[in-house]
């Protein structure tokens, strides 16, 4: 599959991307964040294409899972700075604020996609201070409720995640940070 995807990227013109974007926008849908998996393993030309694709779709950031390898964050940060286009590194419960701060130190356009449920579960503190300190680097938030100490996902209001406080901070400061409701439901098979 990776080779098929690589070949597809080499064939799809940015004109086709514009047509795709136009269809979505005509339906009232804006594409703000473009999720790209496997970007750290891509050749330079492919990474350039991903940035052009994201911009062509109308996005304001690329999202990808955070790497704990500094060389990955430096390399992708160089592309982000070259294209003057944010990369929001998505963190999980194992991601500490220092991981994002390290990424920030490597490139102006390295940012954070903070999943506030994962943040609470892994760091056992509110994400609000981190959001306040780094709001200019946060591309978007994933909203979910989890318990401290790597606890499970819960219905909103039953976990330890201060969802209301986070949303109020965004609203009161008028920060342009997209907050996306991430819902988890068990999937029935069969």
Say what each PLM segment does.
Residues 1-19:
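Glycine-rich, proline-tolerant flexible connector loops at the mouths of alpha/beta enzymes
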Residues 4-6, 34-36, 60-62, 150-153:
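A short, structure-level motif marking secondary-structure boundaries and short turns
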Residues 10-11, 41, 67, 157:
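Residue-level marker of alpha-helix boundaries and capping positions
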Residues 12, 16, 46, 158-162:
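Soluble or luminal CAZymes and related metallo-dependent hydrolases
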Residues 17, 23, 27-114, 120-122:
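Active-site acidic/histidine proton-transfer and metal-coordination neighborhood
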Residues 82, 100, 105-116, 120-190:
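Histidine-acidic metal/acid-base catalytic patches
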